[in-house]
Regions:
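Conserved AMP-binding/adenylate-forming
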Residues: 1-34, 111, 115-118, 285
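Conserved pre-ATP/AMP-binding loop-to-beta segment of ANL
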Residues: 60-75, 82, 105-112
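Conserved AMP-binding A3 loop
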Residues: 71-98
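Conserved AMP-binding/adenylation subdomain of ANL enzymes
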Residues: 95-112, 120-159, 213
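Gly/Ser/Thr-rich phosphate-binding loop
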Residues: 158-162, 166-212, 217-221
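Conserved ATP/PPi-binding loop(s) of AMP-dependent carboxylate-activating enzymes
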Residues: 212, 223-252, 274, 284-286
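AMP-binding/adenylate-forming catalytic core of the ANL superfamily
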Residues: 235, 260-348, 367
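AMP-binding/adenylate-forming catalytic domain of the ANL superfamily
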Residues: 345-366
Length: 373
């Protein structure tokens, strides 16, 4: 069966997940923050056969069984439309957990994870699943809380997974390792922070600080070293399929990520952003991420997202949405344009800057660029 887990994060969630696996079933975590109509749409789309809530365990009519070996169905973050159900097997979950633990030199007798990200999304759920697979202790919090995150480190927790906004709100220096996913990482990160790259289809982060984990292969477009193109990933931690039965992988098992990037001469991956988010201005392609990274170095800027608006002359123009630091005044547009022009390219400099209170984000911390307008 596919069992929807409509429970808050915490020990009861972990107990229920373990019981589902022990019964040979697969779990579909439901985000408890969703309004009820959104939950019902999610259930109608992904069609679990049973649902577990605080009130009990119920059959759900019209559900579709899983394939043998399936472990999870996880909704994508939905930055580009209605979330899909990504099917992961016990083999792919194990491969991801083992590769992560090896890459971080995790010792179950020494280390302890803290799970504080939403468990309905792969970044939070993978902390719990790798704990179950490897036997590493894990403290599961119902939600991110600054005081609790800091106090858990003082109590001996050594590993935590955060998104950029959460990292900026707490002191995580007490952890041996902080995995950072979601939105673009700050240019200057603490020494215990590892910047991760991955997605629901890859079973969470599969590239750490630009280097693929064991068992992960990377390719760019046609394979030309140093060229900019779509990032392709291959490895045993990839999804089996989507819930509707479609398989996004190409011939040879390569998964097209939809992200643009390149592989440096030293083998490390640089990701520039979603292929669909490239701004084409005056015939030149502008990737948002490099522009955001440069603007983030300005003292006045707390957060920034770069995208586009239609332009009658240039086709599209580069626009920066900026969240200011408390008490800061907005930098002059001319200053921003000069900085970006000198660090990235003159044509990449924003034509417009919009000051906002906050950036729209997915539960996983990624900016929803389509909601910037």
């Amino acid at each position: 069966e596919l069992v929807a887990l409509d429970l808050p994060a915490g020990p009861a969630f972990v107990v229920a997940l373990r019981a589902i696996w022990d019964a040979g079933d697969a779990a579909l975590p439901i985000d408890p923050r969703l309004p009820r109509p959104a939950v019902e749409r999610r259930l109608d789309t992904l069609r679990p056969t049973r649902i577990v809530t605080r009130q009990g365990n119920y059959l759900r009519p019209g559900g579709i069984p899983i394939e043998p070996g399936d472990a999870l169905v996880v909704a994508t973050s939905g930055t580009s439309g209605e979330p899909k159900g990504v099917v992961h097997t016990h083999a792919s979950v194990t491969a991801s957990a083992v590769a992560t633990s090896a890459g971080l030199d995790v010792d179950p007798d020494r280390d302890r994870w803290v799970a504080c990200l939403p468990l309905a999304h792969i970044g939070g759920l993978s902390v719990v699943t790798r704990s179950l697979v490897t036997g590493t202790p894990c403290t599961v919090l119902e939600r991110f809380d600054v005081d609790t995150i800091e106090s858990e480190a003082r109590r001996g927790a050594s590993l935590v997974s955060l998104v950029t906004t959460a990292l900026g709100r707490c002191d995580a220096s007490g952890y041996r390792v902080v995995l950072l996913g979601g939105a673009a990482a700050p240019t200057a990160s603490p020494p215990n922070v590892i910047k991760t790259y991955g997605m629901t289809e890859t079973g969470s982060g599969c590239v750490y600080d630009g280097r693929p984990l064991d068992g992960v292969e990377l390719r760019i477009g046609d394979g030309t070293l140093g060229a900019v193109g779509e990032v392709l990933v291959r490895g045993s931690m990839l999804l089996r399929s989507y819930r509707d039965g479609t398989d996004p992988r190409l011939a040879g098992g390569w998964l097209p990520t939809g992200d643009g990037g390149r592989i440096r001469d030293d083998g490390t991956l640089v990701v520039y952003g979603r292929m669909a988010e490239v701004v084409v201005t005056g015939g030149e392609k502008v990737w948002p991420v490099p522009v955001e990274a440069v603007m983030a170095t300005l003292d006045q800027v707390a957060e920034v997202a770069v995208w586009k608006r239609p332009d009658p002359e240039w086709g599209e123009r580069v626009v920066a949405w900026v969240v200011l630091r408390p008490g800061a005044e907005a930098p002059a547009l001319e200053e921003v344009r000069a900085l970006v022009g000198s660090e990235v390219a003159p044509y990449a400099a924003p034509h417009e800057m919009v000051i906002v209170e906050a950036l729209p984000r997915t539960p996983g911390g990624k900016v929803r660029r389509t909601d910037l307008f």
